[in-house]
Amino acid sequence: MASAPRTRSRSQSAARRADAAPTSGGAAPARGSSSARGSVTPHLQARSGRGGSFALQRLVMLELAAALVVCGWLVGPAALVPAGVVAGILALLAVVRRRGRSLPEWLGSQLALRARLRKAAGTALPAGVDSSLAPAVECEPNLRTYQYSHRDDHDRRPVGMVGDGGFLTAVLQVEADAGALRAERGRTPLPLALVRDVLDVDGIRLESAQVVVHTQPAPAPHLPQQSVVVTNYAQLQAETASPAVRIMWIALKLDPELCPEAVAARGGGLLGAQKCLVRAAGHLSSRLTGAGFRANVLTEEELSAAIATSACANPMVTSQADQGDAPRRRTEESSRSWRCDNRRHTTYWVRRWPQLGGSGVALPQLVARLTAVPALATTFSLTLARSGRQDVAVTGHVRVTGRSSTELSDARRALERAARQERTGIVRLDREQLPGVLATLPLGGAR
């Protein structure tokens, strides 16, 4: 049964097609039960607002420009001049690009950013929101948390959920073993086939399953190179490049409209949707446990804490926010970064994957190298969603975090350098940083 709501992330990033996908610092190619659904190699598709959609828009504008010139020529000199001017403007819009984007797309993203900034300035934080969840609520005001309690078994842990009235998400925290700090990065890979298979369980069709890997380097980048901590970690880092913190979450997102029969069979409404999500989360938890992992479905309080951890919210600010009478806004978006408390973030979209498996880089190694850059924290998000009957759409995002603008700039350069070395194409989401952040929080992935 559900408690009263406390607080849909809608990222505009579209998906890439794959039979499955790359994943965490303990991730690997998924192998399904049938050969047709075997190993995982992403095949890029167009992102919304980029790629194929822009190519079509450019073709239409060029054809329209040519048609205007022809019509003006047929009508006569009086019509040819204005037709030529309009055709020239259309051609410029089709051909000229600013920062790698078409002019219409660039203008659209700029207007969208201004609209979000105006909305943020005029939106107050709802009363009663948990301070741990407040940064996410500032990004998506409709977010609320819920708690589902098992009526028939009071010894079972309650299940926490987050949603905006249109979706519900439950989160599992997954650990490989107690020696993960010194383990080789790919020694215990996450079986992505299990994550993929949970998209459809007992008629429950999930919108997406998201793997989030949150890492903090060892030692922290702000420590001087001659410090004792840096010296002591040098040998360990040379052997394994192990982070100080590596947390893996799997967020399961349910849109009740995708499986109305399953929701109705379990009572309908919010309760029916919660039962569907609990069934899917329990199924994945059981299968991961059987594969040798420790998987815990988070409670409401743990879920809020996980979102705060992923957002790198300052614990001191979070604790003080509960004591103040009038909560102050803790987040701010700019064209190239997003700020939460005194930490700054920049999110990238994975536009091009390298060759994976075989003679190429292994998935666990790729993710580990991208998240090993010197930064306060690095977050890698991978979202799997159904695309047709057999296909799985894959979306990847990477977010780096720094304590200052200078530290963030250094982290950005390090990430871009690491991506080039791994032959991975990443695109900084200029003017789309807030949607990018929402795509990297454990809320269920990009929309």
Features from the language model and the residues they span:
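Membrane-proximal, solvent-exposed terminal domains/tails of membrane-associated proteins
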Residues: 2-6, 232-447
